[in-house]
UniProtKB/Swiss-Prot annotation:
GO terms for cellular component: cytosol. PROSITE patterns: G_ENGB. Its cofactor is Mg(2+). It comes from Dechloromonas aromatica (strain RCB). This is Probable GTP-binding protein EngB. Gene3D superfamilies: P-loop containing nucleotide triphosphate hydrolases.
Length: 220
């Protein structure tokens, strides 16, 4: 049973003045257009259409807030990097998302979703460089891991971990494999997000041997 299964849509925010005013913690999800961001949110919530999955990249252009059972929030940020996005939309992204990421006191951490076949693009790194000065944690989901063999998954994971290790502050940064299609990596992601949101994870009944899951998330 997903930890965040009671997530429900709350509101869409197009201007910073419309952000929720309560002081509860929230986690933001960012990623390139079509990297699997909305699918990852839906998978973590155990829902099919909580976050809208568009076949048209760059469609989502506002902050979408989802309320969790514990009163905390998931925030779905607009996908970035879609080349055909009009200049006005790109400017809106920078005008809304930049201040949100740098100044939102309630933001507990940032989840960056990257297609495992094309991780650490220039735009991914620009976003991360934008966020790192806040001193808040970043968790990278290498999505669509089912598209690669186990050997290539491990190779990609090691490569991204090696680059992340150069950032220093190892406790702030973590990486894992994730597949919305196979529901792989869900519990691993839940543990990270629960710690950020200060949510207790109830022990699950052990009905068999432990799931080996993906090969590691924490930085060495």
């Amino acid at each position: 049973m997903p930890l965040f299964q009671k997530a429900v849509f709350l509101t869409t925010v197009a201007n910073l003045r419309d952000l929720p005013q309560d002081s509860v913690r929230e986690v933001a999800f960012a990623g390139r257009s079509n990297a699997g961001k909305s699918s990852a949110i839906n998978t973590l919530a155990g829902r099919v259409r909580l976050a809208f999955v568009s076949k048209t990249p760059g469609r989502t252009q506002h902050l979408n807030y989802f309320t969790l059972d514990e009163g905390k929030y998931f925030v779905d940020l607009p996908g970035y990097g879609y080349a055909k996005a009009p200049e006005a939309i790109r400017s809106q992204w920078e005008g809304l998302i930049g201040p949100y990421l740098s100044k939102r006191d309630q933001l507990a951490g940032l989840v960056v979703i990257m297609d495992i076949r094309r991780p650490m693009t220039d735009l991914d790194l620009r976003l991360i460089d934008w966020f790192r000065p806040t001193g808040r944690p970043i968790h990278i989901l290498l999505s669509k891991s089912d598209k690669l063999s186990r050997q290539d998954q491990t190779k990609a994971l090691r490569s991204v971990k090696a680059e992340v290790a150069t950032w220093g502050d190892a406790d702030l940064y973590s990486v894992q494999l994730f597949s919305s299609l196979k529901k792989a990596g869900v519990e691993e992601a839940e543990r990270v997000l629960a710690s950020w949101l200060d949510i207790e994870i109830k022990q699950k009944e052990n009905k068999g041997p432990p799931d080996k899951g993906s090969p590691g998330a924490k930085m060495p």
